[in-house]
Amino acid sequence: MKKRSGEYAERGDYHANLRQDWPYLPVYLEKMKLARQLLDATDPNGVIFDMGCGEGILVDEYRRAGYNITGMDLNYASPSILQKNFLESGLEDSSVDLILCLDVLEHMPFPEQELAVAEFARVLSPQGRAFISVPNLAHFASRLSFFFRGELIRTSSIERHPGDRPIAEYMRIFNKHFIIRSRRGLFPTYPMISLLTVLAPSSVIGLHRLYNRFLAPPNLCFLNVFMLEKRLA
């Protein structure tokens, strides 16, 4: 049986029923593609947790494929998802092989973000990895807006993303506990692609892939995706 609270009580399982006019659609699809590529190359017998997984799209998909993957979310519960705060995960030290945390940290207040990253490092095995995506407050369009209007373009409302911050600040937090092995930018917010994404998101998915491949310096992108390895003492 599923239990929903927060935005899932209000909006339903919106990641499972994607709206074609959702402006975030092209970025979401690219992010999920990268996550699936990682999981496909991961040992299914390893211990995997998707922290802040929402409806558990990846959790349910890969459990059906035989993976040892569990979700954890404050606002969702199902047979494969534990409804709890992952800051109080209850997991043993060095007990997890892979953590996914996709577009979650920005929903947390600043002090809790570093606590979350430290908790990931605590529960990961010595060879453990964390796959984390976070939006970048200092993306290209946001910088233009600040230059001309004195105002940054937030990645969502301040109520929804209280922890919105420039990507360099996230990286400083990651570097305290992890080694950044890879970093990739999605959706460089140049004027043309930004306008088209707002007007017709489902029609520019291919254009996003092209931009992401050739024209996406991470510092200018809306979303950054990181592969982190646990920093050993």
Where are these regions (language model features)?
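Conserved N-terminal segment of class I S-adenosyl-L-methionine
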Residues: 1-94, 98-100, 114-117, 186, ...
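Activation segment
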Residues: 78, 90-93, 108-109, 141, ...
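Short catalytic micro-motifs in class I SAM-dependent methyltransferases
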Residues: 103-107
